[in-house]
Amino acid sequence: MLNSAIAAEKFLMKNKLVYIGGPTCSGKTNLSILLANTLGTEIISCDSRQVYKELSIGTAKPSKSDLKTIKHHFIDHLSIHDEYSVGTYSMETNEILKSLFNKINIVIMVGGSGLYADSILYGIDRFPKVKTDIKKQLISLFKNEGIKRLNSMLEEYDPEYYN
């Protein structure tokens, strides 16, 4: 146990994740590209909208030339039709970080989605995947009977949480 604790401490001392956060159009992207060029590293986006291929307007994505110059992760990563969550983002990002830290010792994470950033910086509670048929059933109940029906079910099944 002590050896693994020592190894973890050495890993953390050797490897650094630099986080650049802030509101849209505050200069985060330009700063991250400047730093990545200077440090010879890659960029991980923690933006909940830049991840989607179809969302380009209003998301302040890096330019095509910036994307060619510096390796960016999670820009145009998937379609808006794909199911995605902060939990999935957290798992994928942690895998990428492990891989990157085997090659380089500093990585830049940039974006304004606080929940995405917090999932990496502080961790996230893991929840089991909800079965598709359960989701469909609850959505149907909501559409047909409204939120009051869902609230009464919650009160019945988990009165402590409901209150």
Question: Can you say where each PLM-predicted feature lies in the sequence?
Answer:
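Phosphate/pyrophosphate-binding catalytic cores of soluble transferases and nucleic-acid-acting enzymes
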Residues: 2-163
